[in-house]
A protein has these predicted regions:
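Long, C-terminal-biased catalytic regions of enzyme "large/alpha" subunits
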Residues: 1-198
Length: 198
């Protein structure tokens, strides 16, 4: 990019665009035009494409396997990139979240990442951790929220392609994930989770 910037006198940017609705729209049009084309998911699924250079949504349950691959790819972009850690239910507490963030920040060069739990809302009882379709307290139907790309929306409002992606999504299992690379030596706030009072 810097060569082109120098040659043409313009600024260029390499970005992993989110493509919220086009991942489905383009895959649907491509499937219609070329019935045998490969799209994300399994045969018979509603067609969709995986966002930018993200891994297939069902690639692994080990967050560090995914981070190892994405760390090499996403650092090539000059902006507009993010790694979403889809966690299903929330982490047990803020200390677990702080520990995971510290581990990622200490061992990876990724510029942006999110911890993205799924949660549900009951009109009567409020917040419920994870995907809970029926409130355990009153039996009412809930609204399930998850990150569609850069923001949260009720899953019921997603387009068919994003719904298929959500159905195929494998959530990272933090308890059964293991860091395989040697720990990098970086300056961090020592024992952050233990020292901070809430």
């Amino acid at each position: 990019l810097s060569d082109y910037q120098e040659q043409y006198g313009d600024l260029y940017n390499l970005e992993a665009t989110p493509a919220e609705s086009t991942t489905y729209r383009l895959a649907k049009h491509d499937r219609k035009r070329w019935p045998g084309i490969k799209t994300a998911g399994k045969p018979g699924d509603t067609p969709y494409y995986t966002n930018s250079s993200h891994l297939p949504v069902d690639y692994t349950v080990d967050i560090f396997d995914a981070l190892d691959i994405q760390d090499e790819l996403q650092t090539l972009y000059t902006s507009g990139t993010v790694f979403h850690a889809f966690l299903g239910e929330k982490l047990p507490d803020w200390k677990a979240a702080a520990s995971l963030v510290r581990t990622i920040a200490s061992n990876y060069k990724l510029p942006y990442y999110t911890l993205s739990p799924t949660y549900s809302i009951c009109k009567e009882h409020g917040y419920l951790a994870g995907e809970v379709k029926v409130c355990p307290h009153c039996g009412a139907k809930t609204e399930v929220y998850s990150r569609i790309t850069g923001y949260y929306r009720p899953v019921q409002n997603w387009n068919d392609g994003k719904l298929q992606e959500y159905a195929n999504r494998t959530e990272y299992d933090i308890d059964h994930s293991s860091l395989k690379r040697p720990t990098r030596s970086v300056v961090t706030l020592s024992n952050f989770a233990e020292d901070v009072e809430v």
